[in-house]
């Protein structure tokens, strides 16, 4: 109705969701994965809003870039997804209210981070409430679960632990340490670690990158005697900078399926966003989470 093709709208929605994902721990799957790895390795995980100061800068600069520059590179492929008219369907206000309140309650519990209610337990309880109140059928709930993603994340969580315990993480850390030198500046540390993780996430996807690279980051932090939390934050933000290829995040692949955008479209729009994210990180890390 606004005269904008569905394919262009979907890519704008994709980037908007990614910008917003930087604002909280659960905004992007890779953020939550980082917290999980930190907990597994004996570190206190990031809080719900620890990432927020960085996310605000990324959201503001990212939105300005996309509005005035990036949107000019979005072609209209002419493809119309099957759900393009979903907004025209009649809304069940009762179910929508229940689902909205349930989601809000889950987010509040996660934000409060009570010791006896882990994040995943709160999410499962919320899902059961939605199904129990018939906002969603059991069949639809089962189909909504991305089983491939669950298996991938579960497997890579074990692999990330193995990388650390086997010494492979230390070996990879030494390669990066050779690049950093004996007395690297905080700027050099942030730059090398950020681009190593950001490059990996473009070809490997964000969650696997976090699960595999975070143990390496902790080894680097120990070797050069800097805060492991600062290094973890750099890796987390770099891993979430999944803009430049269709492979960088599951939602990118979904968007390609719906819009038929090309690899080159993501590169043209996404690379500047990776650089914007880096700019925010290199400025904000010394302020909000110094080494």
Where are these regions (language model features)?
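Membrane-interfacial loop-to-helix junctions in multi-pass transporters
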Residues: 2-9, 45, 94-100, 146-150, ...
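Alpha-helical transmembrane segments of multipass membrane proteins
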Residues: 18, 37, 41, 107-111, ...
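Hydrophobic alpha-helical transmembrane segments of multi-pass integral membrane proteins
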Residues: 25, 182-220, 224, 228, ...
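Hydrophobic transmembrane alpha-helices of multi-pass small-molecule transporters
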Residues: 50-174, 190, 273-274, 278, ...
